[in-house]
Amino acid sequence: MANPAPNLECRMYESRYPDVDMAVMIQVKTIADMGAYVSLLEYNNIEGMILFSELSRRRIRSISSLIKVGRTEPVMVLRVDRERGYIDLSKRRVSDEDKEACEERYNKSKLVHSIMRHVAETVGVDLEELYVNIGWPLYKKHGHAFEAFKIVVTDPDSVFDALTREVKETGPDGVEVTKVVPAVSEELKDAFLKDIRRRMTPQPMKIRADIELKCFQFDGVLHIKEAMKKAEAVGTDDCPVKIKLVAPPLYVLTTHTHYKEKGIVTLNKAIEACITAIEEHKGKLVVKEGARAVSERDDKLLAEHMAKLRMDNEEMSGDEGSEDEEEDTGMGEVDIDGGSGIIE
């Protein structure tokens, strides 16, 4: 007979109900005559109610403008009747600070819950059992299980090996005894580790600065090449610096790092090193856009810009005569790894 499927329904926190004056995340389910019925997302979707009088501090002109079915948002807990399971909530009493803190907590809890649920399903254990033995103890010890999971990424044993649970066994003499055993088996540890590292390993961000670099002196291109090398030499193992030509005289400096502030500081130092080197040969560096974190969209726009500039340069080169081609402006394309420093 096949094993029954594990129960994957469970609240996120040990307490079955939220505390009064606590901000919680809800989703609106239905709108009735007196108020809106909602699900408390962090408490296994138990039902709560927001009276229309608790929607806004101002005079209500349109209910639909204040609350809509399907909307997810933070609200404040007014009353909790644990015996009857009634929870009264307020939208008008939750402050901006409460909203921000609630959203941050909920986003962390949602990720933890997703990992817990996936592990429970993978190993075939009830989700609540996993929370009792692992999840909620981590909340108690670390303030939030999310913080514990961040440690698991690099040091899983320090988190999991400290967790224990009690089991009752009957000895040879028929007497029931309680034993303390590890809460996390090797199978569970492997499942957690795989899922946590996949979802929570921080991805390096890209930091970029845009500059103009010129040198009209004799061997100007070589001086630019040396200045670029000085800039790249500032890079470190966790903040390597690369400088790339967009189209003369435009260049971009980039680094990939887990530490945004350190990446910005490193690029600024690289720019300073480049300025010092190029000014020794009467060249000039102008910062067009300072060091900042960039997105994939920014990279796509840069690639499109580079392609357009290269195409424009090729068209201009085709229109110019051979005499113009021999002229050295000191701003030619630089191959920092090549011998001559000039891309033919």
UniProtKB/Swiss-Prot annotation:
Domain annotation S1 motif: ranges: 21-92
Region ranges (Disordered): 309-344
CDD domains on file: S1_IF2_alpha (cd04452)
UniProt keyword annotation of Kinase present: no
Pfam entry (one): EIF_2_alpha
Function comment: Functions in the early steps of protein synthesis by forming a ternary complex with GTP and initiator tRNA. This complex binds to a 40S ribosomal subunit, followed by mRNA binding to form a 43S pre-initiation complex. Junction of the 60S ribosomal subunit to form the 80S initiation complex is preceded by hydrolysis of the GTP bound to eIF-2 and release of an eIF-2-GDP binary complex. In order for eIF-2 to recycle and catalyze another round of initiation, the GDP bound to eIF-2 must exchange with GTP by way of a reaction catalyzed by eIF2B.
Protein name listed in UniProt: Eukaryotic translation initiation factor 2 subunit alpha
Organism annotation: Arabidopsis thaliana
Lineage: Eukaryota, Viridiplantae, Streptophyta, Embryophyta, Tracheophyta
Gene behind the chain: EIF2A
